[in-house]
Regions:
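Ferredoxin-type iron-sulfur electron-transfer modules and their immediate structural context
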Residues: 2-167, 171-173, 177-180, 193-200, ...
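Short, intrinsically disordered linker segments that flank or connect zinc-binding domains
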Residues: 187-191
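Long terminal segments
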Residues: 216-220
């Protein structure tokens, strides 16, 4: 099936999301809440595009909009730019300290609105990526709490989580750097909890926190061998080479 994006013919399969098709063809669509490791969420709505079918156009969220037939897609026309600019300023109101949001506002010439009251000191746009990463890749230690303008991401009762393993997946996927994580040579601190770091017994590289390694080993049903992924691969290669007489 062929659709056109900004006048460019793009091959695709029925059911593919517009964002996937655009990126595969080198067409830029801005996103915040999207990560290739997870299904689309449509939370930030920054990836809106206009889809025209049979002469009728409508604004859709490209990361969760599956193509079901031939259509024309516009990622940066006047209608899209106007709505995207409003979305960016609303996101800036939510996260005025985010340099990423400020850069996007400048890049897409988002109009300024004095009537929006900014939330002081915030970088979080409530995209939900951190919660999704923790739930799908780790232990589900964080969640959204409260409602309205007081809605935020937190551990239960804002106390150090008893189940958090300190893997840092939440901070890694955060698009605005809202989650604070700090490390020394021996410790990692995140969500007001400090974890002891484990180093590779061969090369000394940081592998992860003790809790993270225990959790991963338990899920895999294997014992931890004390090696990082690189040294483990090297050891396996050495075994193969020895057995082959190389």
């Amino acid at each position: 099936m062929i659709i056109t994006i900004n006048g460019i013919p793009c091959e695709c399969e029925k059911g593919e999301y517009i964002l996937q098709i655009a990126r595969r063809n080198g067409i830029e669509i801005p996103t915040l809440c999207h990560h290739d490791a997870f299904a689309g969420q449509g939370c930030c709505r920054l990836c809106i595009v206009e889809v025209v079918t049979k002469g009728r156009g409508r604004i859709v969220v490209s990361c969760v909009y599956p193509v079901d037939g031939e259509c024309e897609v516009y990622t940066d026309n006047e209608r899209v730019r106007r709505q995207r600019g409003m979305i960016l300023r609303l996101l800036e109101t939510r996260a005025p300290e985010s340099k990423e949001i400020q850069a996007l506002c400048e890049k897409y010439n988002a109009p300024k609105f004095d009537r929006f009251i900014k939330i002081d000191g915030s970088k979080c746009v409530m995209c939900g990526l951190c919660v999704k990463a923790c739930a799908e890749l780790s232990v589900g230690a964080i969640s959204t709490v409260n409602r309205g303008v007081t809605k935020e991401i937190a551990t239960p009762y804002h106390e150090p989580s008893s189940v958090c393993v300190g893997c840092g997946s939440c901070a890694h996927v955060c698009p605005t750097g809202a989650i604070e994580i700090s490390e020394t040579n021996d410790t990692r601190t995140i969500w007001d909890k400090t974890f002891k770091l484990v180093h590779c017994s061969s090369c000394g590289a940081v592998i992860g926190t003790e809790q993270e390694i225990w959790y991963a080993a338990d899920r895999a049903g294997e014992e931890f061998d004390g090696l990082c992924a690189t040294c483990r691969q090297k050891r396996i290669a050495d075994v193969f080479a020895h057995n082959a007489g190389v």
